[in-house]
């Protein structure tokens, strides 16, 4: 007896079972779900997979998103604790890990999260060997290095969200002072996503006008306008938000969706993201930190050779040393 579906639909050819732009988010905590909703709202993927170890929450988050399918352009949302659900992902976003506590440095998190990654990363690569991995968990620069080592993937397919958000905060805060929109205020935060980040004051501009040329003391202790405080606000902002609401999630979620849009649409936009910088700016160790990088469908394809002043290069090297001093003590990075 024919079913209602048989009566309604005449099949012409079997549908495709392999997704074109599948994205996986590992970890359905506050950050993971902010990433998920930001990705969905931008309509970046045709399939979204969620993975976590907490099954009830995972199923609940999946159902909640599925119930909004009418309002989305992503027709398939799936979830499971088994990583087979992630198969054929173009990009895997890793947000899982121990949450940063109030007053805790990102670098203090490292060894606790390494052990989590030793389970996650081999599973991701097993099911999506051609994927690009975007690491979001903190401390992001060190965990991007850990992911690179555990995954065996080439360095252009292991990217850390890095200073994409720091630079967004920097541009927002400067734009607030100048009374313009953040997109019209250009500036870069490089180095560690954290306390030793580097504000590139020499490159800050509005409409191509160098602000440091107009105020040579900009970013220094001698600056009468105290622009250096803007960078301090960037560094302190995550700690402040955590103190006020317990965690950060919305801005990093939007930042991740911004990166994914560039990758999945092959836009070749330049972002400050974490990459392997050995051999650049006099850095001799295998560390990951943020430089201006071109992203596209192949991953991180090139690095912009930004002209930095001597003091900025010194700060970048200090950032690399800060990361290496923690990284060199990480135990057993075999998957």
UniProtKB/Swiss-Prot annotation:
Catalytic activity: (S)-lactate + NAD(+) = pyruvate + NADH + H(+)
EC numbers on record: 1.1.1.27
Pathway note: Fermentation; pyruvate fermentation to lactate; (S)-lactate from pyruvate: step 1/1
Gene: LDHB
The UniProt record lists the keyword Cytoplasm: yes
Native organism taxonomy: Eukaryota, Metazoa, Chordata, Craniata, Vertebrata
Keyword Cytoplasm in record: yes
Name the record gives this protein: L-lactate dehydrogenase B chain
Annotated Gene3D superfamilies: Lactate dehydrogenase/glycoside hydrolase, family 4, C-terminal, NAD(P)-binding Rossmann-like Domain
Molecular functions per Gene Ontology: L-lactate dehydrogenase activity
Cleaved signal peptide residues: none
Protein task: Interconverts simultaneously and stereospecifically pyruvate and lactate with concomitant interconversion of NADH and NAD(+).
Family: Belongs to the LDH/MDH superfamily. LDH family.
Cell location: Cytoplasm
Enzyme class: oxidoreductase
Any Pfam family: Ldh_1_C
InterPro entries hit by this protein: L-lactate/malate_DH (IPR001557), L-lactate_DH (IPR011304), L-lactate_DH_AS (IPR018177), Lactate/malate_DH_C (IPR022383), Lactate/malate_DH_N (IPR001236), Lactate_DH/Glyco_Ohase_4_C (IPR015955), NAD(P)-bd_dom_sf (IPR036291)
